Design a protein with these regions (language model features):
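Glycine- and charged-residue-rich phosphate/anionic-cofactor binding loop of Rossmann-like
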Residues: 31-33, 302-313
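Beta-strand-loop-alpha-helix segment that lines the small-molecule cofactor/substrate pocket
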Residues: 70, 76-77, 81-128
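N-terminal Rossmann-like dinucleotide-binding module
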Residues: 1-50
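Short acidic-hydrophobic, aromatic-tinged amphipathic segments that line or gate anion-handling sites
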Residues: 54-58
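Contiguous beta-strand/loop segments that form the cofactor/metal-binding neighborhood of enzyme cores
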Residues: 187-272, 279-306, 320-324, 337-384
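Predominantly a Rossmann-like dinucleotide-binding segment in NAD(P)-dependent oxidoreductases
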Residues: 119, 128-211, 219
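Short, conserved SAM-binding/catalytic segment
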Residues: 45-52, 109-114
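Conserved acidic residues
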Residues: 34, 53, 69
Length: 384
């Protein structure tokens, strides 16, 4: 079988990561970059060791002209559904960046459209390709930490002010009347939410019973940059995910499984797992991961199951929908944040947020429940 012809939609921003991955897979003879779809052509330097792919702004026309049979969609959130369905209509299987859609309605339109075309689609939650997930699930199933009381997740990241000016849709909940929902939990730290749901065994829409949100912003943006969600699954598991882009120091995000006899911490970007339990010393191990584009190629070649088909992100989309339909994020009072120098622009640091985010994951409590002086009670619940 020859190299799969691939078209990349969106070659800038996170698209650079995909270009690097395509270089790696191209060197192995697995893919050939046939085209790049972007409003402005990429410079030759960005395409080093990728040949001279066709370039143009029309994804469907580019797929037809190049004979591509796979497409990577790495474009603004509010364009995901339309472009993925365009790729499917022109005969390509798709690797679609997260979040798959800005609303539950658009997500359902996406899944219906893909089913009607019979095309495969992988959602780009790279953490769900980690081999550590199976290890954690097996530890839980074997009773290593006793009865699971709940799952927490924490993300302390730093983003400077220029991050929210990188594109017209950055930091927006809506753009020209169209949902975008570019919030901390729905985009940059979406992996924390998706990974926690996966470890809870709750991946489908119907697996989520209730979602409550606390959305805040320190920056002058529409969307949230400091938030938490309290999720109740249909199984009764409580999941609390807290995240900020206004941390004093950037830290590796993690998910922690709390049990009656111990805990399991999973740093999902590092594929690293720490088991801590009574009567035993700490046991830390690192695992490999399967690249999601490689998994899509294997699915096309021999039917290998997709690791992250759209159906496996339905629960995550319930969280996106809860964030979308919540009241607009509340501003953190200026007295509760400070400005700090960044590498390219200034950034805002919420007082004590690093410790607060970690405490939310540790205690399975929201910012308001932890007594944050700027936090308000949880927003009305979004139920199924």
């Amino acid at each position: 079988m020859g190299a799969t012809r691939v078209v990349l939609a969106g070659g800038r921003g996170h698209g650079h990561w995909h270009l690097d991955n395509l270089r790696r897979l191209s060197a192995r003879g697995l893919v050939r970059l046939a085209g790049v779809c972007d409003v402005t052509p990429l410079e030759p330097a960005a395409l080093t060791r990728l040949g001279r792919p066709a370039q143009g702004p029309d994804l469907g026309a580019l797929i037809d002209a190049t004979g591509a049979t796979a497409a990577i969609v790495c474009t603004p959130i509010h364009t995901h559904t339309a472009l993925a369905l365009t790729a499917a209509a022109h005969g390509a299987d798709i690797l679609l960046e997260k979040p798959p859609a800005p609303s539950l309605g658009e997500f359902r339109r996406l899944t219906r459209g893909l089913a009607g075309r019979g095309r495969a689609c992988q959602i780009g939650f790279q953490s769900l390709g980690s081999h550590a997930l199976r290890a954690v699930r097996e530890l839980v199933a074997d009773g290593a930490v006793g009865e699971v009381h709940g799952i927490g997740a924490a993300g302390n990241w730093v983003r400077e002010e220029h991050y929210f000016r990188r594109a017209a849709w950055s930091g927006r909940r809506r753009l020209d009347g169209t949902d975008v929902v570019d919030g901390v939990l729905t985009n940059p730290l979406a992996h924390a939410v998706a990974t926690a749901l996966h470890l809870a065994g709750s991946t489908a829409e119907e697996d989520v019973e209730e979602v409550r949100t606390e959305l805040y912003r320190a920056h002058e943006i529409e969307s949230d940059d400091t938030s938490c969600v309290d999720i109740r699954t249909a199984r009764g598991t409580r999941i609390v995910v807290a995240a900020t882009l206004c941390a004093a120091r950037a830290a590796e995000p993690y998910v922690v499984v709390h049990g009656s006899r111990g805990r399991i911490t999973f740093w999902y970007k590092q594929d690293r797992v720490l088991l801590q339990r009574a009567g035993h010393g700490p046991d830390e191990r690192a695992y490999g991961r399967t690249d999601l584009l490689e998994n899509l190629l294997a699915h096309r070649a021999d039917g290998t199951p997709l690791l992250v088909p759209p159906a496996a992100t339905g629960a995550f989309m319930r969280v996106v929908e809860a964030v979308r339909t919540a009241e607009d994020p509340q501003p953190v009072p200026p007295s509760r944040w400070r400005t700090a120098a960044g590498e390219r622009s200034h950034r805002r640091v919420v007082d004590g947020i690093d410790e607060l985010v970690d405490a939310a994951a540790e205690k399975l409590a929201t910012f308001a429940e932890l007594g944050a002086p700027w936090a308000a009670p949880l927003r009305p619940a979004a139920r199924r």
